[in-house]
């Protein structure tokens, strides 16, 4: 199915952007509004997909049902069940059974790992495993990479105005892989953890280097979002939503630039501030605010010691 459009237009275009009209992603449902008037509403679908790594069943996830190969690969990567140097020799998808099997060149056995299952705060009941943090402190994010505040305006406009299932039906989260001011690949799902995994899978399958990328999400900045972004080795995480304190602690521990409440030229950064180049300027949006207030609108820096999470 044509779940997304591949675009080769100009430097501001997506490489791949959502196709909200793809078959099977939503259905039309009749109902009434608050006045009793008849309405017909597009509603997103939910499908169970069971992921296998070689011969072992790992998890069943409720998902939108698109890009399931990317979803499976990204999930296994973010759960430390696949390594970046692992060789995938095949991916099988049985749409009727709702099964995806990822086959690797070497044998795998995660029976012990699966006993340490943790339910996350992600929509659609995300699942993590107790040793998900085992590689976290070993990952070194590139400190030389800069994030220009001016890029955020272009990114936000391109992302928020692009066709998407969120705009047509709602009840969905989106994640976008970006480079500087340009959005590259967009993925959506009913759970933000699924959307993240789809991006991780796409990067692995397309051998995309992460060091100079930006990760944009519509969801909350939680520990799961921070952990997965760090494991993907992307140095900047941006959201139009807010933070949890534990996510901020983890971002600082990893040296991740964490930016939330992003809207237009306004944002709040709580970690990795040294990467930010404040080049957006003082335009009409901030013209009526004193200089110190303008600085606060764009940046909040918490100087209190952070807590360690183990």
PLM features: residue spans?
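Short, Lys/Arg-enriched N-terminal segments with co-localized hydrophobic residues
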Residues: 1-8
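Intrinsically disordered, low-complexity regions enriched in acidic/Ser/Thr/Pro/Gln residues
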Residues: 10-174, 178-179, 184-186
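A short acidic/small-residue loop/turn micro-motif
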Residues: 66, 191-192
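Histidine-centered active-site/metal-ligand motif
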Residues: 173, 193, 301
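Feature captures the catalytic cores and cofactor-binding loops of soluble hydro-lyases/lyases
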Residues: 192-281
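C-terminal domain-closing interface element
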Residues: 271-299
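Single conserved hydrophobic/aromatic residue that forms the stacking wall/gate
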Residues: 300-310
């Amino acid at each position: 199915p044509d779940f997304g459009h591949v675009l080769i237009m100009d430097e501001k275009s997506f490489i791949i952007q959502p196709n909200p009209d793809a078959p099977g992603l939503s259905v039309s449902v009749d109902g009434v509004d608050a006045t009793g008037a008849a309405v017909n509403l597009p509603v997103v679908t939910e499908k169970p997909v069971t992921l296998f790594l070689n011969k072992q069943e790992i998890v069943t996830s409720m998902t939108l049902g698109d890009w399931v190969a990317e979803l499976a690969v990204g999930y296994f990567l973010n759960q430390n069940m696949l390594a970046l140097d692992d060789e995938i020799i095949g991916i099988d998808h049985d749409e009727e059974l709702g099964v995806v099997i990822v086959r690797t060149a070497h044998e795998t056995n995660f029976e012990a790992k699966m006993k340490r299952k943790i339910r996350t705060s992600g929509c659609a009941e995300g699942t993590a495993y107790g040793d998900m943090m085992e590689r976290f402190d070993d990952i070194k994010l590139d400190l030389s990479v800069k994030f220009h505040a001016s890029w955020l305006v272009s990114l936000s406009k391109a992302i928020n105005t692009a066709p998407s299932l969120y705009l047509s039906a709602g009840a969905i989260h989106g994640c976008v892989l970006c480079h500087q001011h340009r959005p590259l690949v967009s993925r959506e799902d009913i759970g933000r953890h699924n959307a993240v995994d789809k991006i991780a899978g796409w990067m692995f399958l397309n051998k995309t280097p992460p060091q100079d990328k930006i990760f944009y999400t519509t969801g909350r900045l939680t520990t799961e979002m921070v952990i997965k972004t760090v494991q993907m080795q992307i140095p900047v995480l941006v959201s139009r939503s807010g933070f949890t304190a534990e996510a901020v602690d983890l971002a600082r521990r990893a040296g991740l630039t964490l930016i939330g409440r992003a809207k237009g030229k306004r944002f709040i950064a709580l970690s990795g501030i040294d990467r930010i180049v404040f080049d957006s300027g003082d335009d009409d949006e901030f013209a009526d605010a004193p200089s110190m207030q303008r600085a606060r609108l764009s940046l909040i820096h918490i100087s209190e010691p952070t807590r360690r999470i183990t």
